[in-house]
Amino acid sequence: MKRIGVLTSGGDSPGMNAAIRAVVRKAIFHDIEVYGIYHGYAGLISGHIEKLELGSVGDIIHRGGTKLYTARCPEFKDPEVRLKGIEQLKKHGIEGLVVIGGDGSYQGAKKLTEQGFPCVGVPGTIDNDIPGTDFTIGFDTALNTVIDAIDKIRDTATSHERTYVIEVMGRHAGDIALWAGLADGAETILIPEEKYDMEDVIARLKRGSERGKKHSIIVVAEGVGSAIDIGKHIEEATSFDTRVTVLGHVQRGGSPSAQDRVLASRLGARAVELLIAGNGGRCVGIQNNKLVDHDIIEALAQKHTIDKDMYQLSKELSI
């Protein structure tokens, strides 16, 4: 293999730049040319493809976002559109592709693989919802951003004796909410993977108030439902002074943590190794702190699951 491509797709995550850097430097170390595909699959279709050199990835390992930009591209689901993308890759002499992104990005890589073009997926999403890996690039940074925000909100919640409902990202996965809620001692954590009873939430808050608790923190993953509606329900049922904070896209930004920089470097380099070895149609990950790779089609057939033990622990510690 003499030439590979790299793109980032879907929602950005801190550490994507570190992964791009690793792909470029690892490939050049092995005398392989690297071409960057800008704006994800949309850029692949339009041919926005440029050669990357060592200097192209200098001074980016510590930066959030993605140097290659990103975009969502629903039209890539069309086989004819994907063929246009493959034609662009072949036009530029690209023999293998590294795709950095989340579930939708993996779906695109899977489809390209099924159409005969070798791809390797690298998990880049703050949601931590990709099968085949314990952690995704960006999750740790986002988690620390959320924890810092909740720490600050708890300060004002304590001062004003208020209940705060804090919404974090996670349409289908509650990892950010669960980990942040546990780390910050939240009184209640609501995640998409686990059903909840609003009356039970109310009862828990009232029990806390009866034993002298003056403030509470409730962490809600966005996939559970409207945090605003939850906050209104709590205030109406308890008369507690209640506020709602939606953290939003601040969770996606910022300089990546050391853990995300190292993880991205390891996974990006491993993706190149797989392409060099002729092992396309794979996705890389980390499990028990060891690099692993899986068949991307088989990996996508799996479903992300929450850590049940951690969820149970969060309930036991929030009595």
From Swiss-Prot:
It is found in: Cytoplasm. Catalyzes the phosphorylation of D-fructose 6-phosphate to fructose 1,6-bisphosphate by ATP, the first committing step of glycolysis. GO terms for biological process: fructose 6-phosphate metabolic process. It comes from Bacillus mycoides (strain KBAB4). It catalyses: beta-D-fructose 6-phosphate + ATP = beta-D-fructose 1,6-bisphosphate + ADP + H(+). This is ATP-dependent 6-phosphofructokinase. Keywords: Allosteric enzyme, ATP-binding, Cytoplasm, Glycolysis, Kinase, Magnesium, Metal-binding, Nucleotide-binding, Transferase. Substrate binds at residues 125-127, 162, 169-171, 222, 243, 249-252. Its EC number is 2.7.1.11. Its cofactor is Mg(2+). One of its GO terms (molecular function) is 6-phosphofructokinase activity. The active site is at residue 127. Homotetramer. It is an enzyme of class 2 (transferase). SUPFAM superfamilies: Phosphofructokinase. It holds the Pfam family PFK.
